[in-house]
A protein has these predicted regions:
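Phosphate-binding site of ATP-dependent enzymes
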Residues: 57, 81-176, 182
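C-terminal active-site "lid" helix and adjoining low-complexity regulatory extension at the edge
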Residues: 195, 213-253
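Active-site rim elements
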Residues: 12-18, 181-186, 198
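A conserved helix-loop-beta module that forms one wall/lid of the active-site cleft
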Residues: 1-80, 91-103, 113
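Short catalytic/ligand-binding loop motif for oxyanion handling, primarily in non-cytosolic enzymes
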Residues: 27, 50-53, 69-74, 82-83, ...
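Short, flexible loop/turn elements at secondary-structure junctions
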Residues: 46, 67, 118-120, 135-137, ...
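A short glycine-rich, hydrophobically flanked beta-strand micro-motif that places a catalytic Asp/Glu
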Residues: 130, 205-217
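A conserved acidic, glycine/proline-rich C-terminal tail/linker
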Residues: 194-201, 208
């Protein structure tokens, strides 16, 4: 699996991948390709932290950069936001070249900006679970449900993996993510998420399409083209070979 991801970085280059990796451009693509109703509300796009007028923002929101991974800042109460710490994190992220770090081709040339979005909450007022649909050759195969992704309250970040019939699988896409010891109820909007994932992954050897489900409404999260940058520690080990065989590269070789 990892070797195939590395191969994709070096050989599978289509212009639309730049759009998918750009958190601003992909929203425009989704709006035209699918349905703007599945997009998380955007409050603003900024060239720098100093450009943000926090008086115009709601009490809660999410800040992140448009060109990278891992720069997310969750603000639940802007009166409590540590501006010094947040500015330092985002300024560091704005200078980061995601392409040079891991040679993930899709990130090459994306202009870095800061995007501010609505903070989604589930019916219990908590951050919603992530539904990550892993697609192979344009077909959804597995759905990983992420819990406690941001380790709130020190909780462990765990993952539950299911097939498209919602049968629980006993593996994880990365050893850094614990395997959930419980079974998640089949989401009512599963077929809708799979439909969107099938449409967005068409023509790609492997991709991951992320969604949130809030108040029984599907929201698009992001498209990931290189799972864990091609350095995932799949558990158990034999799943790495099985997943790798699911990626067909013959068309390009």
């Amino acid at each position: 699996f990892n070797e195939k991801i590395q191969w994709m970085k070096l050989n599978d280059h289509e212009f639309k991948y730049h759009i998918f990796a750009d958190k601003i451009a992909v929203k425009k693509y989704i709006s035209k390709k699918l349905n703007s109703n599945i997009l998380i509300r955007t409050y603003g796009v900024y060239n720098s932290y100093d450009d943000i007028n926090f008086d115009e923002l709601p009490d809660s929101f999410v800040l992140k950069c448009s060109h990278d991974s891992g720069s997310v800042v969750i603000c639940e109460d802007k009166r409590q936001l540590n501006h010094e710490k947040t500015k330092k994190k985002l300024n560091r992220a704005l200078k980061r070249n995601q392409y040079l770090q891991g040679r993930e081709w899709a990130y090459k040339g994306i202009r870095p900006k800061i995007i501010c979005e609505e903070l989604l909450r589930d019916e219990d007022g908590e951050l919603p679970k992530d539904y990550k649909v892993y697609c192979f050759n344009g077909n959804p195969k597995y759905i990983a449900v992420f819990y406690n992704r941001f380790h709130r309250g020190g909780a462990e970040h765990v993952e539950g993996v299911y097939d498209t019939e919602w049968t629980k699988q006993e593996f994880s896409f990365d050893w850094n993510w614990g395997i959930a010891d419980f079974t998640e109820n089949r989401p009512e909007k599963l077929e809708e998420m799979l439909k969107y994932a099938r449409c967005l992954s068409r023509g790609m050897m492997q991709s991951r399409i992320d969604f949130y489900l809030v108040n029984n409404r599907v929201y698009f999260g992001e498209i990931t083209l290189y799972t864990v940058g091609g350095f995932s520690g799949t558990v158990p080990d034999d799943m790495d070979e099985k997943l790798g065989k699911m990626i067909r590269t013959q068309t390009y070789e």
